[in-house]
From Swiss-Prot:
Cited HAMAP family: FluC
Main location: membrane
Organism lineage: Bacteria, Bacillati, Bacillota, Bacilli, Bacillales
One Pfam family per UniProt: CRCB
InterPro entries in UniProt: FluC
Designated name of the protein: Fluoride-specific ion channel FluC 1
Originating species: Staphylococcus aureus (strain bovine RF122 / ET3-1)
Gene name for this UniProt entry: fluC1
Keyword list, A-Z: Cell membrane, Ion channel, Ion transport, Membrane, Metal-binding, Sodium, Transmembrane, Transmembrane helix, Transport
Residues that hold Na(+) according to the record: G71, T74
Amino acid sequence: MQYVYIFIGGALGALLRYLISFLNTDGGFPIGTLVANLTGAFIMGLLTALTIAFFSNHPTLKKAITTGFLGALTTFSTFQLELIHMFDHQQFITLLLYAITSYVFGILLCYVGIKLGGGLS
């Protein structure tokens, strides 16, 4: 049954990722990928903190959200491909801005999620 929950979570995450991708319409800064990855980082941090209080009794739901939903929502491979595309087009400032923003804010939002989740549990 766990696989069904992961499948459903993955389908929902993929659908949301697809909808967010429409933010990338101008061919410039890939805001859709950034939004998807930063949202995923925050939710992962939040769920990590809530695991002790809530998800210890619901491990299948945790797998559905983390492995399924967040696994499909976030996209490290697209992020890497976009960085290579920027490099190939000599968009070095945009490349650095995107990479630094993604990593720094990803870590920061994951941390905020952990702290917020700790306060809720």
